[in-house]
């Protein structure tokens, strides 16, 4: 499908989708079946509805923001396949081990006829998150050192990146990008491209600089810049950066004004629940030695234990992206767009936050700037974890972790945000509608009939105008 110049641009987005049958007990919520209950599939419900609606209302893009597959949490069907070919008593057990097993994950994720129709009809863009490879992928230098010492890891990471390039990344590239891509012509001309992809994947894992997974897409007067927040991390000694300097410079070059809207997508939310944001700032400082060597060891254990690995845990990169958002919204990089929106997933709850700027930028006129998080498509948290996530948005928790961050020497951020919608913890799908310089966000919740038996549908959760133009 090509763009209609006289129609609004519609982008559907979400993240974190496990593959499971569309029948009980898998369609039940975790409260009804903690092990198997995944609730209604928002992406599947969206595709079912599309089949019965006017094509003029269909999205122009489906943006999938990570955890399209779960390499470390396989289904019963995939586990049966794994058992048929190797000893699961040896690591990595029932997690995927090689390229062949990755192909099973992708087949299971997208093999349903309804989803095959969706993916054949609507243009897609994707980016990985940790579970596409392994839980907490590239959290820290200590994590990488530990995993590379495992005898099965080299095959896992090589197969994971090779299959990601084939099943996800290749579709992100424009015709011009394909012409410039060093891997595509080798794959196209190789016949059997196994060796080509394995060599590329091994290099992409070992040599961060030189492999760019970030990309940009233009949709008329709207620019989308998708930022890799997993594979390109710099974790060398005292350096902790979300992406290396060359790739960040590329992001800065692409993220400009002179568009009606600038969309920046990153699988990991940039603006977290405030309490978690300050906790990650504190943890990064402590793990780097702010409270001494003994506490640095504790800080690393805490970091890996509760997944403190978002943008706030890479403070230099967080500040650099804040400066970029402010520069675009403030009109310092061309005419300010109608809106700047950061789209994210990962955290298994959905919310909308509006940015404001501090210091020398406070009070200046800016385009509206937002963080829109939509997660999960189908993988809800257990009820006890849902409560913890809600508390992280409340003032008492924020006050405690902000105090800890200041005690560890972390300076106040130049960017602030206020949560206007959420958090909500059901299975969701988000849709952006961009009409000229106007922008509207709609989030819908997936539901099934009582008992989880029957076709899922989508119900409105909230609508929020992001820009009046």
Regions flagged by a language model, labelled:
Residues 1-469:
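Metal-dependent phosphoester/phosphodiester hydrolase catalytic core
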């Amino acid at each position: 499908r090509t763009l209609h110049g006289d129609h609004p641009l519609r982008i559907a987005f979400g993240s974190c989708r496990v593959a499971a049958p569309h029948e009980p007990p898998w369609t039940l919520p975790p409260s009804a079946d903690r092990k198997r209950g995944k609730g209604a599939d928002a992406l599947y419900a969206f595709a079912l509805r599309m089949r019965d609606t006017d094509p003029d209302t269909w999205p122009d893009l489906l943006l999938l923001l990570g955890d399209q597959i779960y390499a470390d949490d396989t289904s019963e069907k995939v586990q049966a396949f794994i058992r048929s070919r190797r000893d699961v008593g040896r690591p990595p057990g029932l997690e995927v081990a090689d390229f062949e097993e990755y192909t099973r994950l992708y087949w299971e994720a997208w093999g349903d006829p309804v989803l095959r129709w969706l993916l054949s009809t609507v243009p897609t863009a994707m980016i990985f998150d940790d579970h596409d490879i392994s839980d907490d992928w590239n959290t820290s230098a200590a994590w990488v050192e530990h995993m590379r010492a495992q005898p099965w890891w080299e095959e896992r990471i090589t197969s994971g990146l090779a299959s990601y390039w084939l099943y996800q990344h290749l579709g992100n590239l424009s015709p011009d990008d394909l012409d410039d891509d060093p891997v595509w012509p080798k794959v196209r001309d190789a016949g059997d491209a196994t060796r080509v992809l394995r060599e590329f994947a091994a290099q992409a894992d070992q040599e961060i600089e030189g492999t760019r997974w970030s990309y940009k897409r233009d949709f008329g007067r709207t620019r989308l810049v998708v930022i890799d927040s997993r594979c390109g991390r710099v974790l060398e000694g005292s350096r902790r950066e979300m992406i290396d300097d060359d790739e960040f410079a590329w992001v800065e070059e692409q993220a400009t004004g002179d568009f009606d809207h600038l969309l920046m997508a990153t699988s990991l939310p940039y603006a977290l629940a405030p309490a978690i944001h300050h906790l990650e700032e504190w943890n990064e400082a402590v793990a780097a030695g702010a409270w001494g060597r003994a506490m640095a060891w504790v800080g690393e254990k805490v970091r890996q234990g509760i997944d403190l690995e978002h943008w706030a845990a890479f403070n230099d990169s967080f500040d650099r992206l804040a400066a970029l958002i402010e520069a675009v919204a403030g009109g310092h990089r061309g005419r300010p767009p109608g809106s700047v929106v950061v789209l994210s997933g990962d955290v298994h709850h959905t919310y909308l936050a509006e940015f404001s700027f501090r210091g020398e930028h406070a009070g200046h006129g800016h385009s509206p700037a937002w963080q829109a998080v939509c997660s999960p498509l189908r993988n809800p948290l257990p009820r006890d974890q849902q409560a913890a996530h809600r508390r992280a948005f409340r003032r008492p928790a924020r006050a405690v972790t902000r105090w800890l961050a200041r005690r560890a020497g972390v300076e106040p951020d130049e960017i602030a945000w206020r949560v206007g919608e959420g958090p909500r913890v059901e299975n969701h799908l988000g849709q952006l509608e961009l009409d000229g310089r106007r922008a509207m966000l709609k989030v819908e919740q997936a539901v099934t009939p009582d008992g989880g038996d029957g076709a899922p549908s989508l119900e409105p959760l909230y609508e929020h105008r992001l820009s009046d133009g």
